[in-house]
């Protein structure tokens, strides 16, 4: 069964409420994917044509560039439903923040999700060794986030939570914040089971 995203954001107070609704829809979308093992998003020619008039994505998803992690599949979303930002290790810098700001301020996207995943090579590199070339910038960022943690799963969690804190610090600390703290959610995708674990519920 296809998950339909219907909610439109009108103002900041509505955005907080809408973000909660969208989050629940993402959870249902992931449950549908885990159950069916199939892609249920709308990628029809009709949807593609409708989107030529503009986009109104329901969530920003910052995730790893890993080929096994496809947000639209994981959350049963189709064209135009997710504003996806991908970078190895799902790390945050000024470029990612700029993309988030564009989605939230210009496209009125109500929810930001940081999605890490199990078996992340960038996290493994931060745990076990030095990185050469440009990769070291990513690894150094993750190493700073995970500190002395040695467990791969816990390190993945810490990396995601650190990214969430950076986003909240960038957009939620002002008197008139672009994002409320409740509009930022942290999660980890299990590449074996297909399930998404939502960290903010327990931390």
Language-model features: locations:
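Short secondary-structure boundary/capping segments
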Residues: 51, 74-75
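Short glycine-enriched loops at secondary-structure junctions
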Residues: 63-69, 88-91, 129
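Short beta-strand segments
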Residues: 62-64, 86, 113-117, 185-190
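Divalent-metal-activated hydrolytic enzyme cores
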Residues: 2-54, 80, 90-98, 102-108, ...
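Short active-site oxyanion
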Residues: 58-60, 109-112
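Gly/Ser/Thr-rich loops at beta-strand to alpha-helix junctions
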Residues: 66-68, 117-122
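Short helix-loop-beta junction
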Residues: 76-84
């Amino acid at each position: 069964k296809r998950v339909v995203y219907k909610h439109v954001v009108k103002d900041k107070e509505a955005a907080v409420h809408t973000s909660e609704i969208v989050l629940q829809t993402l959870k249902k979308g992931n449950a549908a994917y885990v159950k069916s093992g199939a892609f249920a998003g709308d990628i029809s020619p009709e949807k593609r044509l409708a989107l030529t008039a503009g986009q109104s994505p329901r969530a920003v998803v910052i995730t790893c560039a890993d080929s096994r992690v496809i947000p639209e599949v994981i959350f049963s979303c189709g064209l135009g439903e997710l504003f996806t930002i991908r970078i190895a290790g799902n790390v945050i810098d000024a470029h990612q923040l700029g993309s988030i700001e564009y989605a939230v301020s210009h496209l009125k996207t109500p929810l930001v999700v940081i999605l890490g995943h199990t078996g992340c090579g960038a996290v493994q590199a931060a745990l076990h060794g030095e990185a050469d070339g440009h990769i070291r910038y990513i690894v150094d960022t993750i190493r700073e986030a995970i500190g002395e943690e040695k467990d791969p799963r816990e390190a993945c969690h810490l990396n995601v939570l650190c990214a969430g804190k950076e986003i909240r610090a960038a957009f939620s600390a002002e008197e008139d914040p672009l994002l409320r703290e409740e509009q930022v959610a942290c999660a980890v995708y299990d590449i074996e089971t297909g399930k998404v674990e939502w960290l903010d519920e327990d931390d």
